[in-house]
A protein has these predicted regions:
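Juxtamembrane intracellular "pre-TM" segments in multi-pass secondary transporters
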Residues: 2-9, 189-216
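Extracytoplasmic
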Residues: 15-48, 66-69, 230-235
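Residue-level signature of mid-helix packing/kink "hotspots" within the transmembrane helices
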Residues: 31, 59-67, 150
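Extracytoplasmic gate region of multi-pass secondary transporters
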Residues: 33-34, 211-243
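Conserved MFS/SLC helix-loop-helix module at the cytosolic interface between two early adjacent transmembrane helices
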Residues: 64-102
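Helix-loop-helix hairpin linking two adjacent transmembrane segments in secondary transporters
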Residues: 101, 132-133, 139-189
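Short hydrophobic/alpha-helical segments at membrane-entry points of transmembrane helices
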Residues: 102-108, 216
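Cytoplasmic helix-loop-helix junction between adjacent transmembrane helices
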Residues: 108-143
């Protein structure tokens, strides 16, 4: 009995560690790029509109990919879908660090797709596997996500100024999804969940006609708009006035 309890405890600890490490990736690769926008713009000779597109592409990916996340999870399972999200983020970081403006934009879009999957699936995983501790786990992963975002923003400029350049600084951020990827490999071996059918599927279709769902969507959308505008342009604005 004690060995079974110990094994269950280890699995839970690994699951929690994996969730928190995934949470570190869901903002840091976005916030880490913001302080370097001026350097990126100068290096490639980008216009203001093109530079703005770098901060907009992830948001467009969120809007396009997020509605597809549930279908991906039904097809491959939550665990494997989150593994795919980490792979996409790693690939996107590598692509945007290549010496080409085209790859910069492509990599940024790929990163946005990976983050979109993680944003949708991670709260669902917490609700499924920690149904008795949803508030505690949600608070822990939100705190971890915010802390990693702040850490990334603080690190990239000193790293870039130390001789690694903005590409090296952005590439350094791959540490976060790589650690999450490695920690999540044991979880990804779990059997994918069965497709959602019957009343559950009908409920998901009915949500498009729910007034409450649209109100929540509007509230969270405005909240995200304010957050990403500040994250994307706050650092360049402060740098421009010498802070």
């Amino acid at each position: 009995m004690s060995s079974v309890t110990s094994s269950t405890g280890r699995r839970s600890a690994l699951l929690i560690a994996g969730i928190l490490l995934i949470a570190t990736t869901l903002r840091v690769v976005f916030t880490g790029a913001a302080p370097l926008l001026d350097a990126i713009r100068s290096d490639y000779g980008l216009t203001t509109a093109q530079t703005g597109l770098l901060t907009t592409l992830p948001l467009l990916a969120f809007g396009l990919v997020s509605p597809l996340a549930a279908g991906v999870a039904r097809r491959f399972g939550m665990e494997r879908s989150l593994l795919l999200a980490m792979l996409l983020i790693c690939a996107g970081i590598a692509l945007r660090s290549l010496p080409s403006a085209a790859w910069l934009f492509i990599g940024t879009a790929v990163i946005g797709c990976g983050i979109a999957l993680g944003n949708v699936l991670l709260p669902g995983l917490i609700k499924r596997d920690f149904s008795q501790h949803v508030a505690r786990m949600t608070g822990a992963y939100s705190l971890t996500m915010g802390g990693a975002a702040a850490l990334g923003s603080a690190l990239v400029v000193p790293v870039a100024m130390a001789g690694f350049g903005w590409r090296g600084a952005l590439l350094l951020l791959m540490i976060f999804p790589l650690l999450a990827l490695l920690s999540w490999l044991p979880q990804s071996r779990r059997q994918a969940e069965a497709p959602l059918t019957g009343s559950g599927a009908m409920h998901n279709r009915g949500i498009w006609r729910s007034a409450l769902a649209w109100q929540v969507t509007l509230f969270l959308g405005i909240n995200s708009l304010v957050y990403y505008v500040i994250i994307g342009w706050g650092a360049p604005a402060l740098a421009e006035i010498g802070l």
